[in-house]
Amino acid sequence: DLHPRVRRQRQMCIRDSTGGIQTTGNYMGRARTPEQLMADMEEAMRLMPGTAKLNIHASYAIFAPGEFADRDALEPKHFAKWVEFAKKHHMGIDFNPTFFSHEKVKDGQTLSSPDEETRRFWINHGKACIRISEYFAKETGVPCVMNIWTGDGFKDVPADRMGPRMRYKDSIEQILSEPYDHNLVKPCVESKVFGIGVESYTVGSAEFTLSFAALHDGCMPLMDNGHYHPLEYVSDKIPAMLCFYPEFALHITRGVRWDSDHVLILDDETKEMAKEIVRDNALDRVYMALDYFDASINRVSALATGFRSWQKALLIALCTPNAMLKALQDTNQMSKLMVMNEAVKMLPIGEIWDEYLRREGVVDDLHFYDEIEKYENEVLEKRN
């Protein structure tokens, strides 16, 4: 008994995604209801060692039968079932306003729109999300990171680059003027170099978001390692950021040639990002979120594989003799540093990983997919 506007907005999120976002594939078993999505999450978490944190979008609001609230009128009650789910699994919740896939995205613009009615709608959406984020933090007892990202931009060369950014700046400042407990809500601003349909200009560039966060107390920058030129490495940016920001956030993903959001695997850049966080003693300063989607493969497998890959990267970083390697660098023993770096790559990390899984009561890598197949056969296939 979905309200017609709820149904239409869900269809827009699935079929008409805007803001340069794109996913490909149509693998069996896509969740079609909040209950199905929660079931898939529970199955994925069963395969994840350690502690997870839920991260949801404003578009995941759950309405009572026949109920509807547009994004500028969302309330905590529309996310009560997510809080119930998080409490059941002893998790906190991070939150994202959804500034895309909506009929009030005008000419590809939201917070930077020259149309004041459009901009006001999206400012009010951001303010509503501040209130919802504080609700999450109070209910779960865990601070809520609220990430502001929009796909605002232009497909071709703009005549005015500064005007949209000044409007964007004013809009975010108005959102952050909403009263909230700074110990409970951690707002951040995320940049992007380009997206499909906004190839020539993105309002929220890296320089914009870094500068905004630097000049606004309590607002963090967020770096997504898929949101830069392919030859830029977030692993190199992490220590630079740590020199100036007490805290910041990451979206950890895997871009293939562009911001493709492939499922995270244990590749070189993933390992390097984890190493920088660990070797710089920044595990308590960096909020780490995983950000990927691939509709061409089993979605439960994607969730769990990416999570396990990041856990492996952190384990490798924690087992690396960082103090010794730093000492070699500081004494200019670069040949020995190269040799030792290569030696570290052959340390028996796999045995430590297997023991960690055993202690967490989680299936090992060799039998991991057996559980995925079982769930696919018993649950996912029946959804089609």
What are these regions (language model features)?
Residues 57-61, 98-100, 151-155, 190-196, ...:
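Active-site beta-loop-alpha junctions enriched in small/polar residues
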Residues 1-10, 14:
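Single conserved hydrophobic/aromatic residue that forms the stacking wall/gate
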Residues 131-139, 158, 166-184, 201-206, ...:
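Histidine-acidic metal/acid-base catalytic patches
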Residues 24-32, 55-75:
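Glycine-rich, proline-tolerant flexible connector loops at the mouths of alpha/beta enzymes
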Residues 11, 15, 95-98, 245-253:
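Non-cysteine beta-strand/loop elements that form the S-adenosyl-L-methionine
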Residues 8, 28-59:
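Catalytic domains of carbohydrate-active enzymes, especially glycoside hydrolases
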